[in-house]
């Protein structure tokens, strides 16, 4: 097994509970949406987010809001929705209403890898890169802002869908100084882990409280960890 020089992390169900996204972030975005649309609809600041939506849904505040509610009810991971969600969450993070509840092992282990092993830590999530940076810039730990510990960020726009092998190849190609076999991808999603492995990365399933139950087949096929501490020093 090649040494690990880059750890690539999923977010939801890996570094923080799925419930934070489903029960805190999503409702916050829905609650903030009507007021934001009313206040920002014609502003240059909001124009890129509005323009990214399909024309048939971007003609009125009511139409756009209805489309957002529909997409979120189906948990569809569409890039223009993810970008808008990040925009809506920004106010909540900045004013202290939102703080990302990282699992207790995450920040200490990230610091350990970075400081003692020289390992690069990067993020790959279906949430937009701006939303990722808001989350890691406003955690419930000390320090709250751990962005300086992270070397790069990937989403479905700059990398591609998370269940496709080509997305992991594209990510590794951006950092050619690290051979793809020296990357470790950690995720709660079995199909993402399989795609990363097909691309040539090492990959483990992270089994956190609140995550979907893993099949016996998945447990046999892949290494499963409950905490980053199980990985130890790299």
From Swiss-Prot:
The keyword Amino-acid biosynthesis applies. One of its GO terms (molecular function) is magnesium ion binding. One of its GO terms (biological process) is L-methionine salvage from methylthioadenosine. It is an enzyme of class 3 (hydrolase). Mg(2+) binds at residues 10, 12, 188. It is found in: Cytoplasm; Nucleus. Belongs to the HAD-like hydrolase superfamily. MasA/MtnC family. This is Enolase-phosphatase E1. It comes from Neurospora crassa (strain ATCC 24698 / 74-OR23-1A / CBS 708.71 / DSM 1257 / FGSC 987). The gene is utr4.
């Amino acid at each position: 097994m090649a040494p690990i020089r880059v750890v690539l992390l999923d977010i939801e169900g890996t570094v923080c509970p799925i419930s934070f996204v489903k029960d805190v972030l999503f409702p916050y975005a829905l609650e903030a949406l009507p007021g934001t649309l009313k206040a920002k609809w014609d502003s240059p600041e909001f124009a890129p987010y509005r323009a990214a939506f399909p024309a048939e849904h971007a003609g009125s505040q009511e139409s756009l809001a209805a489309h957002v509610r529909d997409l979120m009810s189906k948990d569809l991971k569409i890039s223009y929705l993810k970008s808008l969600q990040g925009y809506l969450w920004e106010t909540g993070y900045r004013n202290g209403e939102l703080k990302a509840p990282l699992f207790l092992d995450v920040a200490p282990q990230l610091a350990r890898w970075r400081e003692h092993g020289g390992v690069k830590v990067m993020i790959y999530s279906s949430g937009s890169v701006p939303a990722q940076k808001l989350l890691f810039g406003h955690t419930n730990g000390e320090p709250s802002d751990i962005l300086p510990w992270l070397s790069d960020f990937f989403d479905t726009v700059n990398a591609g869908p998370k269940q496709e092998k080509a997305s992991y190849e594209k990510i590794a190609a951006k950092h050619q100084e690290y051979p793809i076999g020296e990357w470790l991808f950690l995720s709660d999603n079995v199909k993402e882990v399989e795609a990363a492995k097909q691309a040539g990365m090492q990959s483990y399933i992270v089994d956190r409280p609140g995550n979907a139950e893993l099949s016996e087949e998945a447990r046999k096929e892949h290494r499963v960890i409950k905490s980053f501490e199980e990985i130890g020093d790299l």
